[in-house]
């Protein structure tokens, strides 16, 4: 078989694409092999012996399936995670989530008259200072110091 390296290169330049995208009619290889000038190649392009292949896009098929799976909670285990814990949820977001839960709980306890105003204020400030990591620790503190009213 003839090597059509030079013809392919010239055709790529004329078609304004890469050499891999140049399609040469396999039945007219000899005709292409005899073409040695740019003008010859231009004529073959006009005749349709040499064509430009379409761009092959990147298929989203697998990506869509993976996205659907992730919606269901698959592929989210520790082995699939990259980066720090804070890369998924920032420190500030985490703090907001925690403090809102604690303040909600304190408000609920105050409304139910399980703690008085002074205790509420003291616990509110301690929560702001980061003394309680979660609601469980808040309740442990309340029980330890006997601050909960029955």
Curated annotation (Swiss-Prot):
Residues 61-89 have a biased composition (Basic residues). It comes from Pyrococcus horikoshii (strain ATCC 700860 / DSM 12428 / JCM 9974 / NBRC 100139 / OT-3). Belongs to the eukaryotic ribosomal protein eL19 family. Part of the 50S ribosomal subunit. GO terms for biological process: translation. SUPFAM superfamilies: Ribosomal protein L19 (L19e). GO terms for cellular component: cytosolic large ribosomal subunit. PROSITE patterns: RIBOSOMAL_L19E. It comes from the Archaea. Coiled coil: none annotated. The gene is rpl19e. It holds the Pfam family Ribosomal_L19e_C. The keyword Iron does not apply. This is Large ribosomal subunit protein eL19. Keywords: Ribonucleoprotein, Ribosomal protein, RNA-binding, rRNA-binding. Residues 59-89 are annotated as: Disordered. Binds to the 23S rRNA. One of its GO terms (molecular function) is structural constituent of ribosome.
């Amino acid at each position: 078989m003839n090597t059509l390296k030079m013809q392919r290169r010239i055709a790529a330049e004329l078609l304004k694409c890469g050499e891999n995208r140049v399609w040469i009619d396999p039945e007219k290889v000899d005709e292409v092999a005899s073409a040695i000038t740019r003008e010859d190649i231009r004529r073959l392009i006009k005749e349709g012996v040499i064509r430009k292949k379409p761009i092959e896009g990147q298929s989203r098929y697998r990506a869509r399936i993976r996205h659907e799976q992730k919606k269901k909670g698959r592929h989210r285990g520790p082995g699939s995670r990259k980066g720090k814990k804070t890369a998924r949820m920032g420190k500030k977001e985490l703090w907001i989530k925690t403090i809102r839960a604690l303040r909600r709980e304190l408000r609920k306890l105050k409304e139910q008259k399980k703690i008085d105003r002074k205790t509420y204020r003291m616990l509110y400030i301690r929560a702001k200072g980061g003394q309680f990591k979660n609601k469980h620790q808040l309740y442990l503190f309340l029980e330890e110091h006997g601050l909960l009213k029955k």
